[in-house]
UniProtKB/Swiss-Prot annotation:
This is L-threonine 3-dehydrogenase. Signal peptide: none annotated. It comes from Shewanella sediminis (strain HAW-EB3). It is an enzyme of class 1 (oxidoreductase). It comes from the Bacteria. Pathway: Amino-acid degradation; L-threonine degradation via oxydo-reductase pathway; glycine from L-threonine: step 1/2. The lineage of its organism: Bacteria, Pseudomonadati, Pseudomonadota, Gammaproteobacteria, Alteromonadales. The record marks 148 as: Important for catalytic activity for the proton relay mechanism but does not participate directly in the coordination of zinc atom. Catalyzes the NAD(+)-dependent oxidation of L-threonine to 2-amino-3-ketobutyrate.
Length: 341
């Protein structure tokens, strides 16, 4: 089968002829229709320090996808051949305390599809049936293929009550932009998103942000004054991993504010903890999606009218995958879809 593999420990991704994956008794065999390129895939492509420590070589990469069930193990229940599915990319152990307590997104033994084991950038994928999520008929393949990162946005945004609240999002990558759309959809008052990438900030405007702020050109405090905000942000969503962005968030949070953190800093990050203490801030780390509550919320948000389609800016046939990676690496894109049909 065709597959995109991290074939060598150097920059790049390569098209290979890989063996079709073998299916176990509790697995689904999925024929891939569409995949999306994630920021993680760009880290793997670039072969940065994290990738060198984490990624086995060679390995088929990719974890954002939609496909069709074409076969299943003899123990599988609840799925049929022909079902359209996406899937949770974190394969959990099932026996640690968090798994047994129903907090599977906090499994200490998680194995990542396309990170620790062969992934979805291939004509076929095998995953445990437990990890698959049926896609409702009224949700398109394009949207289903980005459910993984959309789930990061939903999990982060819905960590705290948003109705009537003022929200600051630092980092206008695709996940931050989708989080802005979620916040507005569920009833936040002002949703302000910051970055220095004008292309991404314009996308954020299209997706419903109250204000998309280029912090290289204007001050966050000035924007707050413009919006009539006198007490600071109630909720912060840190999506960038950039220390200066987080420092700005701490400075502009209201007392008693709540911060959900998804962005991963490149190294240790010093902060002024006195601001956290004296403002009584609550910090929550976010990893992945809640299994599977986030997935049901994603489908329901779209079915209730949330439109995240503007975040998809590029489509390429799989044979043109290099153009897709080039678009993502340029920073002048939203989500990039690779078509396998």
């Amino acid at each position: 089968m065709k597959a995109l593999s991290k074939l060598k420990p150097e920059e790049g991704i390569w098209m290979v002829d890989a063996p079709k994956p073998e299916m176990g008794h509790n697995d689904l065999l999925i024929k891939i229709r569409k995949t999306a390129i994630c920021g993680t895939d760009i880290h793997i492509y670039n072969w940065d320090e994290w990738s060198q420590k984490t990624i086995p070589v060679p390995m088929v990469v990719g974890h954002e996808y939609v496909g069709e069930v074409i076969d299943m193990g003899i123990e599988v229940r609840g799925f049929d051949v022909g079902d359209r599915v996406s899937g949770e990319g974190h394969i959990t152990c099932g026996h640690c305390r968090n798994c047994r307590g129903g907090r599977t997104h906090l499994c200490r033994n998680t194995s990542g599809v396309g990170v620790n084991r062969d992934g979805a950038f291939a004509e076929y994928l095998v995953i445990p049936a437990f990890n698959a999520f049926k896609i409702p008929d009224d949700i398109s393949d394009d949207l289903a293929s980005i459910f993984d990162p959309f789930g990061n946005a939903v999990h982060t945004a819905l960590s705290f009550d948003l109705v009537g609240e003022d929200v600051l999002i630092t980092g206008a990558g695709p996940i931050g932009i989708m989080a802005a759309a979620v916040c507005r959809h569920v009833g936040a008052r002002h949703v302000v998103i910051t970055d220095v990438n004008e292309y991404r900030l314009e996308l954020a405007n299209k997706m419903g942000a109250t204000r998309a702020v280029n912090v290289a050109k204007e001050s966050l405090e000035g924007v707050m004054e413009e919006l009539g905000m006198t007490e600071g942000f109630d909720v912060g969503l840190e999506m960038s991993g950039v220390p200066s962005a987080f420092h700005s968030m701490l400075d502009t949070m209201n007392h008693g504010g709540k911060i959900a953190m998804l962005g991963i800093p490149g190294g240790e990050m010093a902060i002024d903890w006195s601001k956290v203490i004296f403002k009584g801030l609550i910090l929550k780390g976010i990893y992945g999606r809640e299994m599977f509550e986030t997935w049901y919320k994603m489908a329901s948000l779209i079915q209730s009218g949330l439109d995240i389609s503007p975040i998809i800016t590029h489509h390429f046939k799989i044979d043109d995958f290099q153009q897709g990676f080039d678009a993502m690496r340029s920073g002048q894109s939203g989500k990039v879809i690779l078509n396998w049909d």
